[in-house]
């Protein structure tokens, strides 16, 4: 046999693959997990939730005085909007109009109703889904968090005017920060204030949101613009909140309807045009009976602060993600204290910059002291931005996302922050002085009225002070607008002491205490809008350092060329450009034509151009002409792009001496002479470092090729340490090898072995490529099959050998092979990491040159085997991280040897072996090793366990006494076509009903002992032909059953008739402890014409108390019985059993072992 043919067959043998097992990676964990098990329809129509918590009001009665009197504790419904002060779009306003106002590319958070998990869609995608007819919607999606402030929709929606008076965002948060907000989305990095005031909720029919409390204990206003809603409301009592928290932490939200666990719950239906106000802390669930469009918003206020703090603490304990929490919560609390102190005492604790921007304090002072004449001077005075503003005007706290160790010293060492002592407040009128301003209750008292706080506000402010004081330093989140938090706390305490005896009746003024001064009276000077640079803002309590700002580096001195002009395009000639998409890689899966969302906007991994060219429109930066090298080969007229300075010129247009460095992998690319000369010294130093690294790599790669007594690395000056493949056009193979000319008098055998080794490597590569080409041409199916190299590209790991020209000091025509690792992250081949492989001299023979030719040939054959094995070992080390063989290189013989070893290992030992390497992982997952899988009595069946079952394809699966759901079992049986034995003892009918479909495998054994909720109708559903695909098969899916276990079920003779009809092969039947079975049941099983009369071999009727001695007369008819268990049957006597045995012992011997256990003696 020719050596070449042998090598080809060897390469084909290396590519032997086994049949791929079925793995559905597209199934998400959410689809596997069991979800809602309670009946939502029953919750919608039952009269159980008939409590009365909601108050119906007229809009004119909802004012600040009402809130001051009651504290906004009860849910409110307004049947019409008269007197509320709300403004809504036209009645025909649709979701498509919402898209036009907020933008079709606006990303919205969409909730999958079935899994209660969130995904993202664009408004255009959501609109298409919303307008899809109901019967064509595959899933139920719900949008409940589209915040539309700072969009065109903002001015079309106005919330109740009373909410404007009490909302902390409008009255407590520095208004200049809110006015500086320009971002319309809720991106936290661009958020200047808690952006939660206006939401648009869009729900389709059937959407359900489980019980929840709005984030941060916020209250909610809610207007039904189109459609309707159904609410379940639970009051926020201490007991109910404890139940709610335990319910959240239990993870059983899909199994437990919280309204059934509390003593009082109200279901209320909201119709179109209703406005609903939900107070702080109320636990509620929402159902959408028809497609609905709702406008609403969240707000914090001062009349229920304890409840708001309590809900925020619950969110802390239940680990609610920061994305779903109230932004800047504790920063808002600090501003609340500051605003109360200022509005009651005229003393501000804001920094000077914040006073200017939000309070306009400088202008107010000048206006009061100087009159109109000074106002002109104020107008003439330029308003300058403090240098601190670029760092400190962000609402992020000093203590959040920074270095906490030096926090106290750093924040108080700023020169503009003055520490104010609160101890001598009674005698010093300048105690509240900041930035030159002096305010004191005695020096500048309020002139209009005596202030009285409601008991709701007093209690809330006390709780707020206690909470902020109890926070550790890294969680205080003091905003940068507060100059001295300690002085602020001291002032609030004094203020609360002074107002502790406020008259409750005088506090009902109908006017909020905290209001911003009006700017129109102060003649605020106009100025152009300036976007204030801010530091990056993250969630206030994430404990994660803020992302470091990338310093802006000065631009290079090279000419600025437009990025669009420099962007390269496809060559349309290489193999990658002319082939189609693979449909397998992550880019293809993202494409819309393959069913993906189409977000990446990237081409297939296999279609990434190997040699992208410059676009036709690019011109020379010196002469302005386009590429003149379309027909000629003149290098001087060819446009070249420098890979360093990105300058595009004709080489002939450069008027300078020196040489450039041509990039042979990328067309029209070089290092221009200017950049090449400047960087030559650095390149030389870098090249030395790379050579030293390459030597270390060579020692690892070629270690199997050396003997134990050889040094690990060849002498660095040895010419044979570099493999040179020299192109020879005369050679029939196109490539010949030669040793280095300076090798000297080395061993002849060593040199010849080197050449043979090099030749074998090259021929093996060429033969593999030719085989791939032939397989592609001879593909009879016409379908595109991926080569091994392409499959490896998609997998992300493969090793190929590419030929490159060496460095300048080597001969110009020599080519150096380099080992190239193709990874999925590489954009194309030129970016792949490269490792230079050097071949060292082979082991010096012990027998010298005088030995005969025969000995030399024998030695060559031995070396070929050694080289092949060493080569495989080296490749495995590079590619497998320690594994002995990889996908294409694994040996079938080696696999079978190891399989014979793995058969003796236990399940735990197999799992340990799977951790060794990828190959062992694949071998240990072989279904021959996992014919039986036992998960009985597992507390929870997780998605990972289900995926593991699918990989192993068991024949017998035990899920007894588990809480597996119907969806999980359906997912399993659809993907286990070879399943024969299924044990579901102790499971519920809701799960077992998954076997009533046409996808149920043909089982041999089914164990339903002591299953919950299974009676005659359920057995009928199991045994009758499935109705989900009529006309497909009119036979039962359990027709091959040989072992049926029904112990402990409430079944009657109707079930036995079904068994006789649909199970002709049944040999073992377990009917123990079925209390409804009688003697007539035994008569049915053994009647003339029944299949069980001849097929049954084992019958278990233990514990059936209604059986009598007459049963034994009927059981004599069973032809091939080997075991009858009648233990526990109180009405059957031992004497009758003995008589029964004597009748059966005519042809075979039977014995009575134990009490009433009849067995055949084999």
UniProtKB/Swiss-Prot annotation:
Residue sites binding Fe cation per the record: 212, 214, 284
Family: Belongs to the JHDM1 histone demethylase family.
Binding site for Zn(2+) 3: 620, 623, 650, 653
Modified residues (Phosphoserine): 28, 390, 394, 558, 692, 718, 731, 825, 832, 869, 883
ZnF endpoints (PHD-type): 617-678
Binding positions for Zn(2+) 2 per the UniProt entry: 582, 585, 588, 604
Domain JmjC: start-end pairs: 148-316
The protein's name: Lysine-specific demethylase 2A
Catalytically driven reaction(s): N(6),N(6)-dimethyl-L-lysyl(36)-[histone H3] + 2 2-oxoglutarate + 2 O2 = L-lysyl(36)-[histone H3] + 2 formaldehyde + 2 succinate + 2 CO2
Gene Ontology biological-process annotations: chromatin remodeling; circadian regulation of gene expression; double-strand break repair via nonhomologous end joining; negative regulation of transcription by competitive promoter binding; regulation of circadian rhythm; regulation of transcription by RNA polymerase II
GO cellular component: chromosome; nucleoplasm
LRR repeat residue intervals: 961-982, 984-1010, 1048-1073, 1074-1103, 1104-1128, 1129-1156
Stretches with biased composition (Basic and acidic residues): 746-757, 771-789
Pfam families with a match to the protein in the record: F-box-like, JHD, PHD_4, zf-CXXC
């Amino acid at each position: 046999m020719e050596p070449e043919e042998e090598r080809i067959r060897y390469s084909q043998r290396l590519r032997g693959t086994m049949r791929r097992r079925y793995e559905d990676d597209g199934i998400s964990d959410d689809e596997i997990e069991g979800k809602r098990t309670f009946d939502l329809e029953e919750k919608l129509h039952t009269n159980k939730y008939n409590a009365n918590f909601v108050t119906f009001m007229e809009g004119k009665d909802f004012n600040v005085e009402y809130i001051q009197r009651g504290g906004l504790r009860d849910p409110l419904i307004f049947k019409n909007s008269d007197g509320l002060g709300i403004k809504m779009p036209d009645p025909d306003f649709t979701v498509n109009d919402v898209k036009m106002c907020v933008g079709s590319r606006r990303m919205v958070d969409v909730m999958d109703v079935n899994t209660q998990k969130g995904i993202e869609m664009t408004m255009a995608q959501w609109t298409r889904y919303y307008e899809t007819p109901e019967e064509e919607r595959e899933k139920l999606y719900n949008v409940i968090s589209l915040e539309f402030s700072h969009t065109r929709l903002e001015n079309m929606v106005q919330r109740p005017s009373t909410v404007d008076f009490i909302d902390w965002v409008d009255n407590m948060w520095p208004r200049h920060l809110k006015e500086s907000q320009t971002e319309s989305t809720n991106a936290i990095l661009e958020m200047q204030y808690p952006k939660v005031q206006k939401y648009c909720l869009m729900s389709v029919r059937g959407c359900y949101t489980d019980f929840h409390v709005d984030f941060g204990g916020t209250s909610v206003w809610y207007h039904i613009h189109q459609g309707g809603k159904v609410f379940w409301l639970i009051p926020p009592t201490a007991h109910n909140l404890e139940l709610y928290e335990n319910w959240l932490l239990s993870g059983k939200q899909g199994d437990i309807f919280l309204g059934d666990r509390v003593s009082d719950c109200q279901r209320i239906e909201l119709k179109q045009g209703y406005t609903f106000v939900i107070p702080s802390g109320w636990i509620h669930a929402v159902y959408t009976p028809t497609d609905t469009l709702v406008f609403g918003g969240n707000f914090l206020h001062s009349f229920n602060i304890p409840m708001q703090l309590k809900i925020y603490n619950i969110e802390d304990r239940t680990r609610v993600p920061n994305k779903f929490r109230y932004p800047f919560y504790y920063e808002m609390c600090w501003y609340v204290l500051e605003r109360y102190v200022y509005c009651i005492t005229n003393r501000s604790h804001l920094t000077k910059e914040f006073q200017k921007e939000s309070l306009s304090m400088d202008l107010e002072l000048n206006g009061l002291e100087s009159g109109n004449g000074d106002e002109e001077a104020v107008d003439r005075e330029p308003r300058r931005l403090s240098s601190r503003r670029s760092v400190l005007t962000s609402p992020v706290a000093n203590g959040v996302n920074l270095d906490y160790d030096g926090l106290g010293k750093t924040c108080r060492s700023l020169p503009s922050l003055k520490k104010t002592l609160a101890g001598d407040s009674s005698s010093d009128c300048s105690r509240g002085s900041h930035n030159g301003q002096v305010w004191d209750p005695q020096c500048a008292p309020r002139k209009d009225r005596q202030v009285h706080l409601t008991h709701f506000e007093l209690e809330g402010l006390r709780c707020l002070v206690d909470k902020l004081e109890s926070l550790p330093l890294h969680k205080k989140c003091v905003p940068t607008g507060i100059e001295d938090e300690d002085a602020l706390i001291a002032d609030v305490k004094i203020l609360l002491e002074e107002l502790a005896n406020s008259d409750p009746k005088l506090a009902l003024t109908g006017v909020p205490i905290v209001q911003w001064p009006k700017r129109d009276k102060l003649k605020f000077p106009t100025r152009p809008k300036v976007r204030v640079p801010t530091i990056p803002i993250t969630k206030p309590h994430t404990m994660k350092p803020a992302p470091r700002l990338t310093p802006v580096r000065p631009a290079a001195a090279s000419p600025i060329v437009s990025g669009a002009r420099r962007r390269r395009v496809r060559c349309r000639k290489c193999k990658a450009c002319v082939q189609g998409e693979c449909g397998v890689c992550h880019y293809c899966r993202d494409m819309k034509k393959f069913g993906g969302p189409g977000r990446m906007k990237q081409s297939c991994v296999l279609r990434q151009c190997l040699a992208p060219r410059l676009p036709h429109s690019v011109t020379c930066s010196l002469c302005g002409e386009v590429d003149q090298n379309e027909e000629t080969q003149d290098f001087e007229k060819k446009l070249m792009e420098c890979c360093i300075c990105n300058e595009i010129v004709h080489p002939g247009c450069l008027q300078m001496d020196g040489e450039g460095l041509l990039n042979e992998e990328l067309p029209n690319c070089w290092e221009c002479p200017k950049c090449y000369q400047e960087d030559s010294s650095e390149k030389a130093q870098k090249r030395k470092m790379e050579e030293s690294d390459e030597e270390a790599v060579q020692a690892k790669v070629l270690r199997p090729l050396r003997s134990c007594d050889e040094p690990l690395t060849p002498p660095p000056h040895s010419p044979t340490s570099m493999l040179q493949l020299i192109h020879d056009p005369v050679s029939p193979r196109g490539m010949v090898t030669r040793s280095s000319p300076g090798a000297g008098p080395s061993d002849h055998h060593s040199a010849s072995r080197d050449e043979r080794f090099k030749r074998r490597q090259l021929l093996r590569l060429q033969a593999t490529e030719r085989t791939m080409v032939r397989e592609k041409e001879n593909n009879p199916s016409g379908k595109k099959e991926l080569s091994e190299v392409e499959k490896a590209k998609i997998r992300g790991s493969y090793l190929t050998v590419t030929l490159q020209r060496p460095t300048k000091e080597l001969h110009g025509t020599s080519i150096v092979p380099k080992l190239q690792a193709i990874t999925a992250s590489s954009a194309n081949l030129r970016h792949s990491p490269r490792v230079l492989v050097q071949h060292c001299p082979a082991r010096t023979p012990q027998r010298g040159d005088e030995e005969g030719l025969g000995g030399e040939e024998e030695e060559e054959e031995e070396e070929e085997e050694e080289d092949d094995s060493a080569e495989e070992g080296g490749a495995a080390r590079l590619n497998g991280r320690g594994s002995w063989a990889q996908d294409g290189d694994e040996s079938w013989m080696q696999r079978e040897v190891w399989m014979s070893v793995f058969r003796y290992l236990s399940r735990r030992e197999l799992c340990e072996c799977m951790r060794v390497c990828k190959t062992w992982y694949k071998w240990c997952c072989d279904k021959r090793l996992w014919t039986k899988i036992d998960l009985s009595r597992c507390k929870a069946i997780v998605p990972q366990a289900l995926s593991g079952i699918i990989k192993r394809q068991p024949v017998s699966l035990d899920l007894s006494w588990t809480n597996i759901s119907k969806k999980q079992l359906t997912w399993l049986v659809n993907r286990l076509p070879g399943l024969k034995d299924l044990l579901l003892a102790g499971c519920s009918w809701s799960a077992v009903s998954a076997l009533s479909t046409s996808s149920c495998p043909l089982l041999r054994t089914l164990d339903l002992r002591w299953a919950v909720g299974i009676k005659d109708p359920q057995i009928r559903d199991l045994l009758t032909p499935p109705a989900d695909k009529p006309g497909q098969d009119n036979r039962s899916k359990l027709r091959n059953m040989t072992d049926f276990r029904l112990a402990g079920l409430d079944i009657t003779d109707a079930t036995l008739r079904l068994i006789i009809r649909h199970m002709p092969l049944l040999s073992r039947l377990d009917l123990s402890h079925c209390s409804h079975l009688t003697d007539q049941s035994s008569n049915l099983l053994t009647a003339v014409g029944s299949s069980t009369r001849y097929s049954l071999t084992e019958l278990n009727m233990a514990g059936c108390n209604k059986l009598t001695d007459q049963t034994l007369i009927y059981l004599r008819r069973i032809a091939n019985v080997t075991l009858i268990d009648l233990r526990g049957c109180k009405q059957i006597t031992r004497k009758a059993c003995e008589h029964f045995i004597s009748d059966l012992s005519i042809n075979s011997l039977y014995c009575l072992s134990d009490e009433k256990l009849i067995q055949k003696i084999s």
